[in-house]
Amino acid sequence: MGVRNCERRAGLVEAGGTTPGSAQRTEEGPPMNTTAQSRSMQAAVVTGPGRITIKTLDLPEPGPNQVRIALEGCGVCASNLTPWAGPDWMTFPTEPGGLGHEGWGVVDAVGSAVTGIAPGQRVAALSYHAYGTHDLAEADAVVPLPASLAGQPVPGEPLGCAMNIFARSDIAAGQTVAIIGIGFLGALLTQLAVKAGAQVIAISRRPFALELARRMGAHTTIAMDDHWRIIEAVKALTGGQMCDRVIEAMGKQWPLDLAGELTRERGRLVIAGYHQDGPRQVNMQLWNWRGLDVINAHERDPKLYVSGIRAAIAAMEDGRLDPTPLYTHVYRLEELDDALNATRDRPDGFLKALVTYP
């Protein structure tokens, strides 16, 4: 399935108004202008729970070791959903462009000390205000994109995240690998594990996701509907040995419980899900008895993020990774609220939202 451009809802709100069940959306300034001659930019600001405004700002100037990027788009990350909901600890309004960290585009200015990167280069970047037409990034957090990827969306951060998780999983040919949760990340990991020669068991709630996993090369798919039925199914598939590697990619308690049950003795349980909603309980008796290696595959070193982005670009070039069919929903900047709500609600057929800046 290719990228699907989502039509704007009928009855889209005017400035300051709402439609039933929608987020409040306001717009400030003229329509978006991303021409090379413009000295202004537009950026989304989250003004409160479920509310955005679009602001027109002066273009920022890069510092000595920074580059400025005219962004083509930004992926929408599920980690945005907690601040979008407005928990007590969240402070509003956000900085312009804030929460966006999956941007790609074309360098249009560089700092005085920057070498090796020039205006006109297309790049993926690790930056933190990418819900806007332009953003600044440190020069060492920018990865040039090859000509072979021209025209393709490249939200570098989640692609790099998938590569880093795959590396920490230590997957090899002939292994049996279960992946619990076939969203964007789980689908990428399915591709990578299959290309590495593993036998992949994909487990997900949604029939759409299971069909997608089969297209990604999964050898077996299992509906995530009953804890003990899944365990027995995997036991039958593996001759009672269970799985060499299990990747939990949902960030919830039940998938974490299930992951432990599916991992064989001295196997590796990889936590790839983003757990945001409180403490977790684990079956330490089971983990101890089986001698599991438990890996928290989330990286926090920006240098590792950037190396993951480089690895993802290489994998896209050589065919090990093809994220293009996974970008299911595309929105304009002024529709960022719709993109966040779709990421939260996950309508049928949803996998990954992009916000693009034509």
PLM feature spans:
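C-terminal substrate-binding/catalytic core of Rossmann-like NAD(P)-dependent dehydrogenases/reductases
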Residues: I231-K235, G278-T328, D338
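Glycine-rich beta-strand-centered segment in the early N-terminal region that forms part
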Residues: P60-G75, P87-H129, S148
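C-terminal hydrophobic helical "lid"/dimerization subdomain
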Residues: N33-R39, D257-G260, E265, G308-P358
